[in-house]
Amino acid sequence: MQRLLTASAAVLALALAAGNASAQNFSDLARQDLQATHDALKANHPAAVVPGAASETFRSWIDAGLQDALSKAGQVNSGESHAYLLRYYANGFRDSNIATNPTFEAASPFFATGWPGVATAWRNGEYVVSYVQPGVRGAPPVGAVVKTCNLQPIADFAKAKLDGFEGDLTTEAARVRTAPYLLWNRNNPMVGGVPSTCEFQVGRRAREYKMSPQPATAANLEAAYRASVFTPGATKLSIEQVDGRPWVHVNSLEDNAGWDAFYAQVESQIATLRGAQGLVIDLRGAEGGSVNATSRGYGLANRIWTPEFTVSRQPEAGQITYRATAANRQWFADTLNRMQSDPRFVQESAPVIEQTQAIVAAFDAALAAGQQTFVMPGRPSVADTGAANPVQGKVVVLVDGGCTNGCLDTLDLLTRLPNVQLAGSATDVDSIFIEPTVQRLPSNYSDLSYGHKAWTTRQRGNNQGYVPAQGLTYTGNPTDEAAVRAWVGTLF
């Protein structure tokens, strides 16, 4: 989960890091942080001791991946490249909940130090030219398909340049999200910059183009990225009327998105939302890394359908397996302390405090007995209350690869409700190793985040997301909002 620092905290973090860097070079800092990441995960992550297929990648990468990453550390020469190498190691676990996040202001998704004036998008299994900077001569046209770069097949070129460093290319969502960077120089010394030549399929012809570096202006880079990947605008929570039916925008699940005002808007229009004309719930770009993301999504569902109707349709929690270590216990003890220090939380959430107290007690018992793990029951399923469905029309839930973590938890509920159709494109995936521990790494340049418990009985499998059914998959340009809306209209 990305942690945002205040300006003063960011300055302090950079000052501390700069003090370290004056005595050590960035390569040494990277080696130090890689080893600390390895040691923390090996000592505390559930996958190290929980059996099953979900743990296999963790176990095969924890040591081998460290050696792989350490072999690249000599190329680290800046804070940005330090972040790239730590991200490479973290992404190698193929676990969306293992992450390293810079404590300084990281590079924007629109950032590049050089580019050929061209951006690509991942469309229907191919890298396709999605943007050409106005005035650039000798560039491939929009729609051309990239076949090779620097004489490498494009699949190999993309894997070497993007996988691990920019995202996990084993997922469709990461291929979409990282595709604009295929031909860019993002200041990562461990991969090539702008390729010298690339071959494109233009209509029926294969043609080679020289990739001539162009000035990388912020405005052009942002325009290029937005032409390639759906990117929500400034207002991420709202309701508008499209083709005579409500279109509910939930393009963020972050805490600062403005939930009180949005929920008030939902409640004021509830009769319309439940009408026979149907409605659209737009979850594109709904990054769900916040601790409260799932509760935000459930809060929307409960307002539209009522808690009495949704409660029996929530997925069964099953059992949770905890890794019994002192560090994991400390996380819960600290959390309990914060809960008990908040008078409002004490008044409103006594059952949560009781549950957390029981978990801390279970940690104590397991540690005293020398157990590596212990199991706690999750929320039991609830019998059907008999409440009627208040929503009269069809509900289309629109998703894409920006739907992550808590957004997927929300879909676990929404897809169980009647007359709901999932449409759009594949979501991201998430692992069964959940609820993040966050710790500062020795350099002060980065935080490590990892799930400290295993939801081994989750009904949606490990690293599984959602893919709309045939006929409900959008194959057009996802950044053409008029086309997307016209297509959604055909689903009613």
Q: Which residues make up each language-model segment?
A:
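C-terminal soluble interaction/assembly domains
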Residues: 397, 405, 409-411, 415, ...
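Extended amphipathic secondary-structure runs
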Residues: 199-206, 365-422, 426
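Gly/Ser/Thr-rich loop/hinge elements
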Residues: 288-393, 436-442, 451-472
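Long, C-terminal catalytic modules of enzymes
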Residues: 408, 460-464, 469, 475-492
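Bacterial N-terminal signal peptides that target proteins for export
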Residues: 1-8
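Flexible, low-complexity junctional segments that flank or bridge functional domains
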Residues: 23-322, 326-333, 394-396, 426, ...
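N-terminal signal peptide c-region/cleavage motif recognized by signal peptidases
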Residues: 18-20
